[in-house]
């Protein structure tokens, strides 16, 4: 059993090392909940891992500055489509797991889509995106309970 686990970890590690990755921050300044409450400014640590073809996974760990002390972990799957030159757009499903003000966990399903710039001669990525979600299982006072969305600007370092 230990050998099988070791082989599995090695294979997963090599697959992550073989593909390009992006790491950086995602900063949101716009957002609302179903009751129109402003959700405040949010920041997320962001990691993208490219899969085969023009597809990738995105992992985000976020924090909210509003009074709910909301912590969020999001996973998204993106399909990428070229626009022109170094520009492309992406869209895909997303799942969020959140924790609100020591009152409980929440689960959200939604989507994420946006546009990005990956200059060929610089190891950065700049992007803007929107993430509409429907969040449930949270206490009623949490800002994200029900339908909500967020718009964000991202800056990431590209690792090839």
Sequence positions of predicted segments:
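Cleavable N-terminal export/targeting peptides
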Residues: 1-22
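Short glycine/proline- and aromatic-enriched beta-strand/turn motifs that initiate or cap beta-hairpins
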Residues: 16-65, 160
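First exposed extracellular module after export/assembly in secreted or surface-exposed proteins
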Residues: 26-28, 123, 127-129, 147-149
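Gram-negative (and chloroplast) outer-membrane scaffold detector with strong preference
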Residues: 48-128
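Outer-membrane beta-barrel porins/channels
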Residues: 130-144, 160
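Outer-membrane beta-barrel "beta-signal"
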Residues: 146-160
């Amino acid at each position: 059993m230990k050998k099988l686990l070791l082989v599995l970890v090695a294979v997963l590690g090599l697959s992550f090392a073989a593909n390009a990755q992006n790491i950086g921050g995602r900063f949101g300044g716009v957002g609302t909940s179903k009751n129109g409450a402003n959700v405040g400014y949010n920041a997320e640590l962001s990691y993208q891992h490219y899969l085969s073809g023009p597809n990738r996974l995105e992992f985000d760990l976020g924090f909210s500055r509003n009074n709910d002390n909301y912590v969020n972990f999001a996973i998204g799957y993106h399909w990428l489509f070229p626009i022109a030159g170094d520009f492309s757009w992406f869209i895909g499903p997303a799942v969020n797991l959140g924790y609100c003000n020591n009152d409980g966990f929440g689960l959200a399903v939604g989507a994420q889509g946006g546009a990005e710039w990956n200059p060929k001669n610089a190891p950065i990525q700049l992007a803007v995106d929107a993430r509409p979600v429907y969040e449930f299982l949270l206490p009623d006072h949490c800002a994200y309970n029900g339908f909500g969305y967020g718009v964000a600007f991202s800056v990431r370092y590209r690792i090839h």
